[in-house]
A protein has these predicted regions:
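Membrane translocator/pore-forming domains, dominated by Gram-negative outer-membrane beta-barrels
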Residues: 1-240
Length: 240
C-alpha cells in the first residue's frame, strides 16, 4: 500500500528561560491511500490536530524535548475484491506523546547528533459501519468493532550532518545529513505484536540568508519485522 499526506501546521513558541522553550500548535492533514492485497481500493482522510511541546538544553551538547498531541479525523474507505464491494465513512480520534534526548557535537565541517526517541500513540476507531454490494444486492447493515490501536516505538538514530557552504554546520545554509536507524515497536490491537528492525535516512536542507525560512527533504527506508517501509518527506517552514 502507498500513502500520500499533505500537512499544514501553525506553531507559537516562547522562551520561558535561557535554556527552555515552550510551544503549541494547531494543524490539519489530508491523506490519500491506495490499498493492495486481498481487497483493493483507496482511503481518504481529513484530520485536525493540536498539541504542545517543550525543548530544554541540559548542557551545551545535550538537549531534551517532549510533545503531546490530540487529533480527530474523518475517513472515507472504498475497497473490493472480485465479489464484494465495501464503502464506509467513519471517524477516528488519536492521542500521541513522546520525547527524545539528542546530543550535538561539532567537528569542523560536520556534526554528530545521536538521538534516542520514544513515542506512544493510541487511536480510537470503535464501530465502523459498511455498505456492501455483491451480485447486485446491497446491504447497509454491515459493521465491525475495530476497537483501538496503540503503538509504542523506541528509535536510536546517530545522525551525521555536513556543512555544504561554510566551514561549520552552524554557519552553513545548506546541509547534507545521513543517519542509520534502529527501531523497536510494540503494536496492540486485539493481539499484541513486537518487532525490531533497522533502516537509514538521508536528507538535504536549505535555509534562507535571514534564517526565517527553511526547506528540507528526507528519504527514509526501514525494515521492521517482515515489513518494508519507505518514505519521502518534504518540509517547508517560515518564521514570522
Amino acid at each position: 500500500s502507498t500513502t500520500a499526506t499533505l500537512m499544514g501546521r501553525v506553531a507559537w513558541e516562547q522562551m520561558i528561560s535561557d535554556d527552555t522553550m515552550l510551544g503549541y500548535f494547531v494543524g490539519g492533514e489530508l491523506a490519500d491511500s491506495n490499498i493492495s492485497g486481498a481487497f483493493e481500493g483507496k482511503q481518504t482522510r481529513v484530520a485536525a490536530t493540536a498539541g504542545g511541546y517543550a525543548v530544554r538544553a541540559l548542557s551545551e551538547t545535550l538537549f531534551a524535548d517532549g510533545f503531546i498531541s490530540i487529533g480527530a479525523g474523518r475517513n472515507n474507505l472504498e475497497m473490493a475484491d472480485d465479489v464484494l464491494a465495501l464503502t464506509s465513512d467513519y471517524t477516528t480520534r488519536t492521542a500521541t506523546v513522546g520525547g527524545a534526548l539528542t546530543g550535538a557535537y561539532a567537528y569542523e565541517r560536520y556534526e554528530l547528533r545521536p538521538e534516542m526517541a520514544f513515542s506512544y500513540g493510541k487511536t480510537w476507531i470503535g464501530d465502523v459501519g459498511f455498505t456492501g454490494v455483491a451480485y447486485g444486492l446491497t446491504d447497509n447493515t454491515l459493521s465491525v468493532d475495530a476497537g483501538t490501536v496503540s503503538t509504542a516505538s523506541l528509535t536510536l538514530r546517530p545522525e551525521i550532518v555536513w556543512a555544504l557552504d561554510a566551514e561549520t554546520v552552524a554557519d552553513s545554509n545548506a546541509q547534507l545529513s545521513f543517519a542509520p536507524r534502529f527501531i523497536c515497536e510494540r503494536t496492540t490491537t486485539a493481539t499484541t505484536t513486537q518487532n525490531c528492525g533497522a533502516g537509514a535516512e538521508i536528507g538535504l536542507s536549505s535555509n534562507s540568508e535571514d534564517g526565517l525560512s527553511s526547506a528540507n527533504i528526507r528519504f527514509v527506508m526501514d525494515r521492521v519485522g517482515k515489513s518494508n517501509r519507505s518514505n519521502v518527506v518534504f518540509n517547508v517552514e517560515h518564521r514570522f
